[in-house]
Regions:
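C-terminal catalytic subdomain
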Residues: 155-159, 170
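Functional-site microenvironments in short loops/helix caps that host divalent-cation chemistry
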Residues: 1-156
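Short, structured beta-strand segments at or near domain termini in extracellular proteins/domains
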Residues: 168-181
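Short proline/glycine-enriched turn/loop segments at secondary-structure junctions
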Residues: 130-135, 161-168
């Protein structure tokens, strides 16, 4: 980030997670698995998770808006579809009024990452507010939110997979934020 800049930019990982969690660490939805929605009990790490249905489009509800129940639904294309993005506002917003923070399109964050570099970062024990890790030799850009092409795991509020920022995909986009004074 450029100190003192107050224009539009990509959010940092911390800003994205804060927005996904709804902005209030004391609210119950801060600990929800998805942005504004709880997980289906016992399905926290499953690709199919009906808990995501109220707030997000993903691989297993992209056709009808409701998750299938098994891989057989995937095989007969009952619910599973590579249909593409959906109009914003068809699912519920989170506490901040933001739509599609989990699902629909995965969104880039600020920074460049080489995951081998990132794994070498040593935690110093110092409190950092909104840290930004940049490795200019990296070709990965962190993203958040999951997409219509991915299972429910990609839509988890603390999941930040990397994407190659020079690649083109209908399932990756961006959302801008504006820096304060």
């Amino acid at each position: 980030m450029i100190p003192g800049a107050n224009g539009y930019r990509l959010p940092t990982l911390c800003e994205a997670e804060y927005a996904m969690r709804g902005g209030d660490p004391n609210a119950p939805d801060w600990d929800y698995l998805f942005s504004g929605a709880v997980s289906e009990p016992g399905k926290e790490r499953y690709s199919i998770n009906k808990g995501l249905d109220p707030v997000g489009w993903y691989q297993y509800n992209n056709k009808t808006g409701v998750s299938g129940t098994s891989d057989s639904d995937r095989e007969n294309n009952t619910y599973y579809s590579y249909q593409g993005t959906h109009e914003v506002g068809l699912k519920k917003p989170n506490r901040l009024g933001l739509y599609d923070m989990s699902g629909n399109v995965s969104e880039f964050c600020y920074g460049k990452i080489d995951w081998t570099f990132t794994s070498k970062i040593q935690y110093t024990g110092e409190l950092e507010i909104n840290p930004v890790r940049i490795d200019e030799t990296g070709n990965g850009r962190p993203s958040y939110g999951g997409s219509w092409r991915a299972g429910a795991g990609g839509a988890i509020v603390h999941s930040f997979p990397d994407n190659i920022d020079s690649s083109f995909s209908a399932s990756i986009g961006f959302r801008v934020v504006r820096s304060g004074d």
